Each structure stands twice: as structure tokens, then as C-alpha cells.
Regions:
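Surface-exposed, short loops/turns at beta-strand junctions within beta-sandwich domains
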Residues: 403-406, 495-500
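C-terminal accessory domains and tails appended to enzymatic cores
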Residues: 2-4, 11, 92-99, 105, ...
């Protein structure tokens, strides 16, 4: 049996988590197991839908499906909020951010359904026109109203409404962080498609697999993720609750919750979402540049500290125009310089900056180097990097000072190739990383391990430990059946021990720990696994009939021609 010190309350830094998604079913796609586990632990989960999911279907059916999902996930209806904007209009919202959008059914203001009011009508005293600006306004209002300890939101997926939601959430958070110096929620982003809804179907493998990417759903194959400013290697992995690891497919709450969204036939994607971990990317909110004054020798520098690393206006383009999201110095500026001024002496330790997206074939559009100068006389030259590996990501740069320094200002002078459109989209400056590790988890063959059976013809898995933050490991140790052991010896010892029965492997100390059971499988284990897979496939076929009926019933809510 697997045991862990992991607590959602510790990981999120409090009791309240807000999940913000564009459509009804995306809550399961990006955070299903996390929502279930957090509620099970007693946390308040607040769910926010940006759109009514009403492009093909009337909002009524999508609301009814949410009510069914909430029962499965034990999510109180009072914690669910519908912003009430239209589905499918991300392109229109982003391309002209002040204009009012009109839904094909004639709606042009936020509204609810099924006797449920939209958020603005209920809390802000009026419905809102369908504009991008009002989406940001509503998001800002709901975040400040509840002030969650953590915010989980969708990131730049291939769907236009996902891009819209990601950009609007980040803009709202940027506005809030600039106004509220003390409120710094933990912000986590995730993808709904390549890692979840359209991920790899590995449910029937011998072991519970961790989240993987389906690279076919990455819009540019040279990118690490669908957001060029996020690296796959930088993802945060967290364990999933036992119920969401249920090996009986139709009893797993993730499968059942997806099944409640019958108009979308979401149940079909259930096996892809049931994994041994859930992955997120953290956007730190302790960036001191957000509260600094930034000036530039040329160009519009307002984008440099708005919390948005990658903005898009024309979603029909695979790569956004640099002018849409980055500071671009004038071509005649021979010494383009940004100056970040603080209102008081500030301790800094690290600078991250994010350049406009470019590739090897487009090298003239990349910065050639940066010179950093500080008010205390320090000068550092950061050359253009050479990137032999895809994962190295040439448009994300970091400089870490040898020791924390106290400064009043920082100046960054950039060199760029002539005629190139090179610039910086965001600057993030950090005093020091206050985050502390909240958990560790044993990993076998790169998979989050819970209980592990070594089946016939399988080798002993490679074992290491995952941490959610830098960890002082001086008092952390492995043990087998209660006896301390070094990792190198352990890998030689386990094959001998499992010949005599299951062993319990533990890593950690008294406060942070994880333990799992490992055993050598026999013919009965192999047959049992095959029988379980056959049972799951058979029950899945039976369930399809029920879900088809639900899908057919939902068609009466479908707009004609859609």
C-alpha cells in the first residue's frame, strides 16, 4: 500500500483553490484528479467557467452536465461560477479587444441558464457586454472576491477559447498583482489537449503511467509545449488520490465525471486522463519587476512587466507576431536599453527574461546578447547562447547572481542583428525563492510509483525521487522494510529481497516521505492483469450504449446548422 505525506493544503499554501477553464469538461481535462483530491482533503475548490460552452449547443445542456459532474466530484454547486461569455469566439475577442461580440443566436451580454445566474449578474449587479475587456474585468473581480490561495488555469492549447482564457487570466492576475502587493496566489497553468484530452491512451499498460505529451497536438514541432515560454522539463508533478487510481475504469471518478459531459462524448477520452500524476507549470507571483518602473530608450516597454509572456491577437497564425507581445526597440536605436527602477533598495538574486519567438532558420529575429548593469556598479555580459538541443529553448534566458545584491535600478542593453525584429516579452526579477518542498514521491522508470509489480520479462525499474522544490536532503534516506539503506546498495538488494515476498520501499524523513510496495509478479498476477484489462474493455463497450443515449438526448439542445 502506498503512503505519502503529500497534502494539497501544503502544496497550494492554503485551503482555497480556484480552477479557471473555458468550457464545461475542461475542469476534468486539466485538474480532475486534483479537484477530487483537494475536495476529499477538505479544501474549498472554486470552479470558474469563462464561456457557456454554447457554440454548438444551448447553454442549458452544458449547465445540466456540470450539475451531474459536481455530484460525482463532491463539488458544492455554490462553488461553481459561470462567467457566461460565448463559446467559440476566441478569435473575435482577441483580435479586437474592445468590440462587442454577438453570438450566432443573438446574445451579446453574459447570461446564465437552468435558473443559474451568470457571475456578473449575481455579484457585479449587471450583465456584461461580450468584450475581451469584460472577460478580464470579470476574472479580476472573481479572483479578488474569493482571493484563493492557488489558481489553476488552462494555458495556450490549440483551441482559440483556451488561448483566450489563458491570456485573459494572466492579464487579470497581472493587474491584481500590481494593485495588491500582499496578495500573491500560487498560479499554476496546464494544457487540456496534448497532455490530457488527446493524450496517449496508455491505460491498459502493465503500470499506471504518468502524464505524457501527444506531440501530434503540439502546434509547432520545434516547441517544447504549446506555449513557447514553457518547457516540458519545468513541469511540476503531483500525485493523484487513490480513488483516481482505481483500476476498474467505470468506477474511476475521472471516467465518470467525463461521462457526465454527454453532449461532448467526453467519456471516450477517459482512459487518456487516468494517470499516476497531474502536471502543472508554475507562474511565480513574487516577481519584483511587477512593482518597478520600466523605461526604454525606444519602443513600447509596457509589455515587459504585465505578467504575460506570450500574447496572441491573430490566432490564425501559428506563431504570434512579436509586436503583439514584446518590447521591440526602434531599428535606429543603436543602443536599445531597458531600465528597471525600484521605489526602494531591493534585494535581487535572479533575472529571467523572455525573448520573442524565433528559430534557427530565423536567427536574425533573435537577440544577439544582453549587457546587465546595476546601480551598485556591477556589469555582466550575457552572450547569445548556442542551443544544440531543442529543450534548451533559445528565447528563455536566466542570469543568477553569485550572491544576492541590493540595487536601486537595473539596466539591460541588448544587441540584435541588423534589420531583425528582436525584443523581450517579459522581465521577471526575484529576490529569492521562498518556496519550500512540500512532498517527495518515489519514481520508477520515470513513472510516479504507488505499488509496483515486476511482471515476467520485466527488469527491475530504475528508482529515483521527485521533489516539488529544492530540498535539503541531509536527513532524507531510503529504507526497505524499515531498514535504512543507500540507494546504490538498494538497487542490488531489491532483486534478492523480492524473491521472498513484497518489500516496502520508503524515502524521506519524519515530515516529508513516500513509501510504496514492490513485488515480483507471478503467473497469477499476469493473468489477473489481463483479465482486468478484458473486463475494463468489456464494461467500456457496455457503457458506450448508455453514453450514446445521453448524446442523442443532448441533440435536442443543439443549434440548427451546428
Amino acid at each position: 500500500m502506498s503512503y505519502s505525506s503529500f497534502k494539497y493544503r501544503d502544496f497550494f499554501g492554503g485551503n482555497t483553490v480556484m480552477v479557471i477553464v473555458p468550457h464545461q469538461d475542461d475542469e476534468i481535462n486539466i485538474a480532475g484528479a486534483t479537484i477530487y483530491g483537494a475536495i476529499e482533503e477538505g479544501l474549498d475548490v472554486i470552479l470558474v467557467y469563462v464561456t457557456n460552452g454554447d457554440y454548438q449547443y444551448k447553454a442549458d445542456i452544458r449547465y445540466k452536465e456540470v450539475i451531474k459532474m459536481a455530484k460525482i466530484m463532491h463539488l458544492p454547486l455554490k462553488n461553481i461560477h459561470f462567467l457566461g461569455f460565448p463559446d467559440g469566439y476566441g478569435k473575435e475577442f482577441l483580435s479586437n479587444r474592445e468590440s462587442i461580440v454577438t453570438h450566432h443566436a443573438g446574445f451579446s451580454q453574459t447570461h446564465g441558464a437552468c435558473n443559474i445566474q451568470d457571475y456578473a449578474s449575481k455579484y457585479m449587479g449587471r450583465s456584461l457586454d461580450y468584450t475581451y475587456t469584460n472577460i478580464v474585468l470579470a476574472l479580476e473581480d472573481i479572483i479578488l472576491r474569493f482571493k484563493p490561495n492557488a489558481i489553476i488555469a488552462v494555458d495556450h492549447d490549440i483551441h482559440v477559447d483556451h488561448k483566450l482564457t489563458s491570456i485573459a487570466v494572466e492579464e487579470a492576475i497581472g493587474i491584481i498583482l500590481k494593485k495588491q502587493v500582499t496578495y500573491k496566489p500560487k498560479v499554476l497553468k496546464s494544457f487540456a489537449y496534448d497532455t490530457n484530452f488527446e493524450s496517449i491512451n496508455d491505460y491498459y499498460d502493465n503500470h499506471l503511467e504518468s502524464t505524457v505529451q501527444n506531440r501530434q497536438w503540439i502546434k509547432d514541432k520545434r516547441w517544447s509545449t504549446n506555449n513557447p515560454m514553457l518547457l516540458w522539463a519545468d513541469r511540476i508533478r503531483i500525485p493523484v488520490p487513490q480513488a483516481c487510481r482505481n483500476t476498474v475504469l467505470i468506477e474511476n471518478p475521472i471516467f465518470k465525471a467525463l461521462g457526465s459531459h454527454m453532449s461532448q462524448s467526453s467519456y471516450k477520452h477517459g482512459p487518456k486522463l487516468i494517470n499516476g500524476d497531474q502536471v502543472f507549470w508554475e507562474r511565480r507571483t513574487d516577481n519584483v519587476a511587477l512593482h518597478a518602473t520600466i523605461t526604454a530608450t525606444s519602443g513600447d516597454c509596457s509589455k515587459l512587466n504585465d505578467f504575460l509572456r506570450y500574447d496572441v491577437r491573430d490566432v490564425t497564425k501559428n506563431i504570434a507576431s512579436s509586436i503583439e507581445y514584446a518590447w521591440i526597440p526602434d531599428t535606429k536605436d543603436n543602443k536599445p536599453t531597458i531600465t528597471i527602477s525600484f521605489n526602494k533598495p531591493t534585494t535581487i538574486e535572479r533575472i529571467d527574461w523572455f525573448e520573442n519567438v524565433w528559430f534557427e532558420s530565423d536567427e536574425l529575429n533573435g537577440l544577439q546578447g544582453v549587457t546587465i548593469k546595476t546601480s551598485n556598479g556591477l556589469e555582466v555580459n550575457v552572450p547569445q547562447y548556442s542551443y544544440p538541443l531543442f529543450e534548451d529553448c533559445p528565447y528563455m534566458k536566466t542570469y543568477v547572481f553569485e550572491h544576492p545584491i541590493v540595487v536601486e535600478w537595473i539596466a539591460m542593453t541588448v544587441t540584435k542583428a541588423k534589420e531583425g525584429i528582436a525584443g523581450i516579452s517579459e522581465i521577471e526579477i526575484y529576490s529569492f525563492n521562498e518556496s519550500k518542498p512540500t512532498f517527495c514521491h518515489i519514481v520508477a522508470n520515470q513513472q510516479f510509483a504507488y505499488d509496483w509489480t515486476i511482471y515476467r520479462r520485466e527488469s527491475l525499474p530504475s528508482i529515483y525521487v521527485y521533489y516539488d522544490s529544492m530540498l535539503d536532503k541531509t536527513d532524507m534516506e531510503f529504507s526497505i522494510d524499515g531498514n535504512s539503506i543507500k540507494r546504490d546498495f538498494m538497487m542490488d538488494y531489491i532483486p534478492v529481497m523480492i524473491q521472498h515476498g513484497p518489500v516496502t520501499i520508503r524515502y524521506g524523513n519524519d515530515s516529508i516521505y513516500h513509501e510504496m510496495m514492490m513485488k515480483k509478479g507471478n503467473i497469477i498476477d499476469a493473468i489477473s492483469k489481463k483479465c482486468l484489462n478484458l473486463y475494463n474493455k468489456f464494461m467500456y463497450i457496455l457503457c458506450k450504449a448508455k453514453y450514446r443515449i445521453g448524446f442523442n438526448l443532448a441533440q435536442k439542445y443543439r443549434y440548427k446548422g451546428f
